[in-house]
Amino acid sequence: MAAQMREPKVVVLGGGSWGTTVASICARRGPTLQWVRSRETADDINENHRNSRYLGNDVVLSDTLRATTDFCEAANTADVVVTGVPSHGFRGVLTELARELRPWVPVVSLVKGLEQGTNMRMSQIVEEVLPGHPAGILAGPNIAREVAEGYAAAAVLAMPDQHLATRLSGLFRTRRFRVYTTDDVVGAEMAGALKNVFAIAVGMGYSLGIALVIARALREMTKLGVAMGGSPDTFPGLAGLGDLIVTCTSQRSRNRHVGEQLGAGKPIDEIIASMNQVAEGVKAASVIMEFGLTMPIAREVDAVINHGSTVEQAYRGLIAEVPGHEVHGSGF
């Protein structure tokens, strides 16, 4: 009788809300280890099956999920790595990982952002720091707390190798969490980074209708994403429009919260200091403008966050745009 293949061990790097949620999902499918920096968080996960700091006391995690603060243990035992650390710490963690990780282990990013200074996507950083390791991204319209509470949701796993993507998608799939696949890594990553900036714009409000901002934001997202090599078919899907809608409308959206606080007149440094999680749109706003395309919504968000503009000035800047062709025009 042939020996049964063992389940691959998933190692999730990062102890935030989405990393923990994905780790708990994976633990229901097979052996999963979560690396966190905080001993308190590790103990909470191991002893109470909770991550109270990021998901509150009501969300109960899989009782088979185990957490560790030992990075070497995590890296040395991984068959699949899932990275949930913020974009500003992503490269540093991968550099540590490169010293310990076995060859060819796939690396799937949960991060929806771009690296400041290089403008690189997370999968590009994986390819640079961990050559030979298949890189992918799990993207889609997911608010961590809602998925952790069991609401039905979906995501797309983007990898160049669709055979591998199909195999790995089963590690994340449950009855209530649907996982599709695509080979458009560029489109999925660009959509994930861009939607955070547009959610800040929605949060700022100032008499701009949500439907108007979302519709025009989708045009800007598609424009830059396609220019970077993404497929136009990706942006009306889960990683694009789906994630854009949920991030712009959910009361649990961190990036929308930043926009609301900006609209209330608070300075960006004060807003960031008051949050215990990262809003990737704050960093992505300046990176997006470096690509040099005409993107009025992103331009005004960047002006408010990084150049001292007010929300009222941002509103006036958008309203001053002359409407042109809905699809081919470059204005708002």
Curated annotation (Swiss-Prot):
Group of enzyme by EC: oxidoreductase
BP GO annotations: carbohydrate metabolic process; glycerol-3-phosphate biosynthetic process; glycerol-3-phosphate catabolic process; glycerophospholipid metabolic process; phospholipid biosynthetic process
Subcellular location: Cytoplasm
Gene Ontology MF, one: glycerol-3-phosphate dehydrogenase [NAD(P)+] activity
The protein's Enzyme Commission number: 1.1.1.94
Catalytic activity: sn-glycerol 3-phosphate + NAD(+) = dihydroxyacetone phosphate + NADH + H(+); sn-glycerol 3-phosphate + NADP(+) = dihydroxyacetone phosphate + NADPH + H(+)
Active site residues of this protein: K195 (proton acceptor)
Binding-site residues, sn-glycerol 3-phosphate: K112, G140, K195, D243, S253, R254, N255
GO cellular component terms attached to this protein's record: cytosol
Residues where NADPH binds: S17, W18, R37, K112, A144, R254, V278, E280
Predominant location category: cytoplasm
Keyword list, A-Z: Cytoplasm, Lipid biosynthesis, Lipid metabolism, NAD, NADP, Nucleotide-binding, Oxidoreductase, Phospholipid biosynthesis, Phospholipid metabolism
Pathway: Membrane lipid metabolism; glycerophospholipid metabolism
Family, as annotated: Belongs to the NAD-dependent glycerol-3-phosphate dehydrogenase family.
Primary role: Catalyzes the reduction of the glycolytic intermediate dihydroxyacetone phosphate (DHAP) to sn-glycerol 3-phosphate (G3P), the key precursor for phospholipid synthesis.
Protein name as annotated: Glycerol-3-phosphate dehydrogenase [NAD(P)+] 2
